[in-house]
């Protein structure tokens, strides 16, 4: 099963046990805790430990058909909030306090030190009461879609929830956070002409990306009080199954949460001049995070936003400013296609926020890992750059503007039949806590040590199994 590519090996570390007896669709890793939630065809969500890969709890009773997608709400302290999307046309929101009981601590391998801490604090709570507190609470059911809900995503700030459906619509809901689990519908977007398969929020801004059966990717933003489409990305020749954002990049070389910038690999062992690296970071910072998409057409494409040009000098107009339209449209270009490695539809792509690696999988049961590297080849001009008027290019030369060093993507690992004869529906990167370090700290109140955590890849298959992989290089 391991890969045979020269760049690295994808090693099967473990399965999450016990597996589901029905098809599993997607797994979502918690933003703070070493746990992951898996969506199942049996109408349930299974929550597993990423410390010892065992089942912690099963969330059920809220949906009447398969749970197709789920997402953890970010920036929530003291509790975990999970949104679930179902084929029954509804979206559920579940809540649970992060105070895990002793039974779960045993499963996580955390019982020793924590049990002693409880005794020192005088914790003599009855076990039955503790078990009751551990239950997930079904907070609210969001109803509005006319057909199967395919994907759900929280905004980076956690106040907005996006859902999409087979009914060709995208709904944006606002969590009022009033203590009564009230949500308000703020937008219903219906520009797609086919099933909407996926929604994903920008990692820093309130900008939403969607992929559809109509072969397009669309970007949405709020303008004043109305949400609307700001870009339509065309290029795929089949259903767009998944879109994912790159981690933010800053000139300082830090992505905002203490993790290093996901720079491309330098194949010449550091010979790339620091000024060239800085130029690459500056250009990426101006463009913002890129998008990766995968499709029925068996391609994976990287998309980049073109920075907006400086506004022209102010010209007085007889038209009042209150009725002059403000342009919020964005221009996106297809930057490249990743090496062709899949024989059938590609269902899922995942862009690591820690390493910058991209993982893909699909109907052929293959998992592929790609990395970006700097290349000595001159930058390839995109069609839109070639179409620039001569005056614009002359202006660039006059201003001494330089093009950032070019990059290319290469395959570093590939595994065939990752789930034997079954299709693989989803892959995602996850943070795995070190079990020995976790035993030394109070799991209830601590976040994972981001500097020392290990990143693993989770694959979710039609066989009901979620597999854990590590990349060895």
UniProtKB/Swiss-Prot annotation:
Residues 384-400 have a biased composition (Basic and acidic residues). One of its GO terms (cellular component) is cytosolic [4Fe-4S] assembly targeting complex. Residues 123-133 have a biased composition (Acidic residues). Keywords: Repeat, WD repeat. The keyword 4Fe-4S does not apply. The keyword Repeat applies. GO terms for biological process: iron-sulfur cluster assembly. Residues 1-25, 112-133, 377-405 are annotated as: Disordered. WD repeats lie at residues 11-58, 62-104, 144-183, 191-230, 235-313, 341-380, 438-473. Disulfide bonds: none annotated. Belongs to the WD repeat CIA1 family. Essential component of the cytosolic iron-sulfur (Fe/S) protein assembly machinery. Required for the maturation of extramitochondrial Fe/S proteins. This is Probable cytosolic iron-sulfur protein assembly protein 1. It comes from Coccidioides immitis (strain RS) (Valley fever fungus). The lineage of its organism: Eukaryota, Fungi, Dikarya, Ascomycota, Pezizomycotina.
């Amino acid at each position: 099963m391991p890969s045979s590519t020269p760049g690295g090996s994808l090693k099967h570390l473990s399965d999450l046990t016990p597996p589901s007896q029905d098809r599993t669709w997607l797994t979502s890793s918690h933003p703070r805790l070493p746990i992951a939630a898996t969506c199942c065809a049996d109408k349930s969500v299974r929550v597993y430990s990423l410390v010892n890969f065992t089942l912690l709890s099963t969330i059920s009773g809220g949906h009447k058909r398969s749970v197709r997608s789920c997402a953890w709400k970010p920036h929530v302290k003291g509790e975990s909030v999970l949104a679930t999307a179902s084929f029954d046309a509804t979206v559920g929101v579940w809540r649970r306090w992060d105070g895990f009981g002793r039974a779960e601590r045993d499963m996580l391998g955390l019982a020793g030190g924590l049990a002693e801490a409880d005794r020192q604090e005088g914790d003599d709570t009855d076990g039955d009461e503790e078990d009751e507190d551990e239950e997930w609470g079904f907070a609210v059911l969001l109803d509005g879609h006319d057909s199967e809900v395919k994907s759900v995503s929280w905004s980076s700030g956690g106040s907005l929830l996006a859902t999409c459906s087979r009914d060709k619509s995208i709904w944006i809901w606002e969590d009022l956070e009033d203590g009564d689990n009230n949500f308000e519908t703020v937008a219903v977007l219906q520009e797609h002409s086919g099933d909407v398969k996926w929604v994903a929020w920008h990692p820093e801004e309130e900008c939403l990306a969607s992929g559809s059966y109509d072969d397009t990717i669309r970007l949405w933003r709020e303008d004043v009080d109305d949400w609307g489409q700001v870009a339509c990305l065309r290029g795929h020749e089949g259903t767009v199954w998944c879109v994912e954002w790159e981690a933010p990049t800053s000139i300082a070389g830090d992505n905002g949460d203490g993790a290093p910038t996901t720079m491309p690999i330098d194949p010449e062992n550091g010979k790339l001049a620091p000024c060239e690296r800085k130029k690459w970071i500056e250009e990426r910072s101006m463009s913002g995070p890129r998008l990766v998409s995968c499709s029925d057409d068996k391609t994976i494409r990287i998309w980049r936003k073109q920075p907006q040009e400086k506004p022209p000098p102010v010209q007085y107009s007889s038209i009042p400013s209150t009725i002059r339209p403000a342009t919020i449209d964005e221009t996106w270009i297809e930057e490249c296609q990743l090496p062709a490695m899949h024989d059938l539809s590609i269902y899922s792509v995942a862009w690591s926020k820690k390493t910058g690696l991209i993982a893909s999988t699909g109907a052929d049961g293959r998992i592929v890992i790609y990395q970006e590297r700097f290349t000595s080849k001159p930058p390839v001009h995109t069609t839109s750059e070639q179409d620039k008027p001569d005056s614009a290019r002359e202006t660039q030369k006059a201003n001494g503007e330089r093009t950032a060093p070019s990059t290319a993507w290469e395959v570093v690992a590939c595994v065939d039949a990752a789930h034997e004869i079954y299709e693989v529906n989803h892959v995602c990167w996850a943070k795995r806590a070190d079990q020995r370090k976790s035993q030394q700290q109070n799991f209830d109140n601590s976040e994972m040590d981001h500097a020392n955590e290990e990143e693993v890849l989770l694959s979710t298959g039609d066989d009901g199994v979620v597999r854990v992989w590590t990349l060895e290089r």
